[in-house]
């Protein structure tokens, strides 16, 4: 967890070992840092600028994206079967995972908005219109999500 604190007396920076004379400093991993010294080991982004969370593993300090890229789990999209990188945002329906762009009705390709109902039939995502049409034609009843 990162915290920005006004400097009351000079402290030593864990990154460069110099005294911190700046107005603000970062505290992370129970150590103090210059804002410029607390960076991701992979992409060199300033961690104080990308959020209030950092990740550590294998003696590396990482941003969220690089942590997930290096140590996250990848999987395949249930709609297109292509790889979903570990750092990518996804949609889930039961045990299925989808790219955001693939999470649409698989009959009419209608994209869903927040709050829209969708239905599952044989692991197919259906909009309410296609679900109701199928229900009238075939009498099936997928689960509502």
From Swiss-Prot:
Keyword Metal-binding on entry: yes
GO biological process entries: negative regulation of ERK1 and ERK2 cascade; positive regulation of fat cell differentiation; positive regulation of nuclear receptor-mediated glucocorticoid signaling pathway; positive regulation of peroxisome proliferator activated receptor signaling pathway; positive regulation of transcription by RNA polymerase II
Pfam families documented for this protein: LIM
Gene Ontology CC, one term: nucleus
GO terms of molecular function: DNA-binding transcription factor binding; metal ion binding; transcription coactivator activity
Keywords: LIM domain, Metal-binding, Repeat, Transcription, Transcription regulation, Zinc
Domain LIM zinc-binding residues, every copy: 11-73, 75-137
CDD domains in the record: LIM1_LMO1_LMO3, LIM2_LMO1_LMO3
Keyword Plastid in annotation: no
PANTHER family given in the database record: LD11652P, LIM DOMAIN ONLY PROTEIN 3
Protein name (record): LIM domain only protein 3
Organism for this UniProt entry: Homo sapiens (Human)
This protein's encoding gene: LMO3
């Amino acid at each position: 967890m990162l915290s920005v604190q006004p400097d009351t007396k000079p402290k030593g920076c864990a990154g460069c070992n110099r005294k911190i004379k700046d107005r603000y400093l970062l505290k992370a991993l129970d150590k103090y840092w210059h804002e410029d010294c607390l960076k991701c080991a992979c992409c060199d982004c300033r961690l104080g600028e990308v959020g209030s969370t950092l990740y550590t593993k294998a003696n590396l300090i990482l941003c969220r994206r690089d942590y997930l890229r290096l140590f996250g789990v990848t999987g395949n999209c249930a709609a297109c079967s292509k790889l979903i990188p570990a750092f990518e945002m996804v949609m889930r329906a039961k045990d299925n995972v989808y790219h955001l762009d693939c999470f649409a009705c698989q009959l009419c390709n209608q994209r869903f908005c927040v709050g829209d109902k969708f239905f599952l039939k044989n692991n197919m995502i259906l909009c309410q219109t296609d679900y109701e049409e199928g229900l009238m034609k075939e009498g099936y009843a997928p689960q509502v999500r």
